[in-house]
Amino acid sequence: MMKAFSAKGLLIEQNHFQQILLRGRGDGSFAETINKEVSLLPPSDNLRMINNDKFIFAKQSFDQWSLICLEKQSDKEMLRLISAMNANEKILASDYSNTLYFEFTGENKDHYLSKLTHFDLRPKRFPVSTVAQTLIARIDCCIYHLQDKYLVTCHSSFEDYFKNRLQDAINL
């Protein structure tokens, strides 16, 4: 974990997680395969997520899931996980590790993140254990609402631009 930015009541840390993008119907054999490999059952509702100490598992659409590895996996283990999931012909799993991860924590995380997006971060609209796909600083991003923080993801090609926009938001 690398400290990226801080301000009064805000800490933003950049992480280097690994991610697997999954496609499938989410039926019984899908759930069984996923549970066998990562000990999590897939969320049934769109834009919901579940997590444990090792993974965040989110349903991003009716047939797409995102599995984020919170603990560093070896390349061999990532390949094994993807291969085990692809062994089920109803699942298409692919490595999606070209993603940036920023953790927003602190009492003012909503204030600063709101400067970069029009997305409604109020708990009534964006409860804990949900995920949203939205524009942040005009970049297509995902926001994962964990208990006391947000995990914001975007494609690695936007790293410099995203960091510059974060700095701009802090300086406003």
Where do the protein language model's features map onto the residues?
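Basic, glycine/lysine-rich polyanion-binding surfaces/domains
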Residues: 1-172
